[in-house]
Amino acid sequence: MLVVAVSPEADWVSRFADEVIAEAERRAPGKPIVCASGLSPSGPIHLGNLREVMTPHLVADEIRRRGHECVHLISWDDYDRFRKVPAGVPGIDETWAQHIGKPLTSVPAPAGSRYANWAEHFKAPMIESLAQLGVEYHPISQTEQYTTGKYREQILLAMRERARIDAVLDRYRTKNRTAGGAQPGKLDEEEAAAAAEAAEGSGAAGEDDGNTVAGYFPYKPYCSVCDRDLTTVVAYDDETTELDYTCACGHAEQVRLSEHNRGKLVWKVDWPMRWAYEGVIFEPSGVDHSSPGSSFQVGGQLVGEIFGGEQPIGPMYAFVGISGMAKMSSSRGGVPTAADALDIMEPPLLRWLYARRRPNQSFKIAFDQEIQRLYDEWDTLGRKVGDGTATPADAAAYTRAVGTAAGLLPVTPHVLPYRTLASIVDVTTGDEAQTLRILRDLDPADPVASLDETRPRLDKAQRWITTHVPADQRTRVLAGPDTARLAELGETERESLRLLLAGLDEHWSLEGLTTLVYGVPKVMLGLPPDVKPTPELKTAQREFFALLYHLLVGRDTGPRLPTLLLAVGPDRVRTLLTPAAA
């Protein structure tokens, strides 16, 4: 087992680990420490939901690094009701509306899916992503827990104590009415919308808290005829546990709750029940669960008063956005998921984005050009960690990103800048022979022997280029010289091209071509190679670069010129940049 030393004061993960270890020793000395997450497979499980997993994962992993036994539970809330038909999900249509109100495990999967039901269809890609990310966890299906009677005693207890539960809930109902439903802090328009949307993907979304005309009942049966939760409890006998309910479909039934396994506790009672049942010490919650009267706040009262447990240490986590897009909602189809992110970036980079920010800090994950800057920052951090110049917090985040207590995650053997790889596969359109030729020329002192050395980063860059870069932003090298533009060149432009072409062979590497393209304008201005940039020199370089881009790709901008020149190749560069003889 690889255990990487991290300063105990280095970062937010270490501080939470300290707190959790101390709290576990107070509550349950000698027992495994329990951290928990909850995910509802009501639709695509987006990158905001991933924070629900990564926050306790990182804390649990730090606890394991210190030699403590720690289990990370992930509860699949697959017994939640199907609330609405999400937009943008392939393989479904308006007919899925007939399943609204059923447990997610009773809803058919989208057409063409190989999975048995809706919940399994949306769990599967998340399970695969968690494996790639190195997340070690113990899964719990809430469908299995409820339908096999695991929570029977807790359900009967909640029904016996329904008056006390109702009194606790009523305190918060009163507070909310008095406060006018105010939310803590100030949210901008985007954050407010995101808060409402996030609730749709949680167990708290759109459900009543158990109030009925006949009284308060914290248990909601699923109808035995239509399988939906459009039911109302109308009577309950504590002695016999006989429960009477009616359903909107017209069915009415009496069941014995000591035997009945087709229903669940309402969310604000279900969550604290699970805290006590599992002995959870640490579980974060989103903003939608942390406002006055929310499930986390109410649960903190119920877990002790009703179920004899204690509320977990529970930091609120902020939203995760997408670069260039509004924040996400799992109730809406088409939102980026962990699988989408891992399609274009390596697992350590995605882990790093969650590890480097405190849970209450928002951040964005880039699917646009910003991903190139993120990769530059990541590679720079790796070099700083290697030479010992990284700050303790940055070094800790890097360590948590590249591995876990169980070992290091797979890495690309021959690391090259993501933006360089993206530019190369953009120009070569993925042709492996051309790509390898260019990669071999990048650095003659450390040549790439095979494409496998640059994988998986090369493959991630290629998928980003082909799936996230608009067609009008792709690089298309001209098929032949722009004879009209070449004929219009002035003597200064012709001389600058002559100097560039004359230096190609001597400078044919990424570093050499960088020196060459920046050096030609210096020569034209009569300046020494090591001169500091001046406004005049910068202007001359911009004009020279624009000329090269126009003659190579027909635009004024493009990928970095040294990379572009390598990708085009010396022979074709000469063809495109050589004016016809006068």
Question: PLM features: residue spans?
Answer:
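Basic, alpha-helical terminal appendages of large translation-related enzymes
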Residues: 1-32, 44-45, 71-73, 174, ...
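Active-site cores that bind ATP or allylic diphosphates and position pyrophosphate for catalysis
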Residues: 109, 135-338
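N-terminal catalytic cores of NTP/NDP-binding nucleotidyl/phosphoryl-transfer enzymes
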Residues: 2-90, 272-291
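A glycine-rich helix N-cap at a beta->alpha junction
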Residues: 93-116, 129, 133
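A structural motif corresponding to the C-terminal end of an alpha-helix
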Residues: 66-68, 125-138
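Residue-level signal for inorganic ion chemistry
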Residues: 46, 158, 346, 548
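Charged, often glycine-rich, active-site loop that binds/positions anionic groups
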Residues: 79-97, 154-155, 326-333
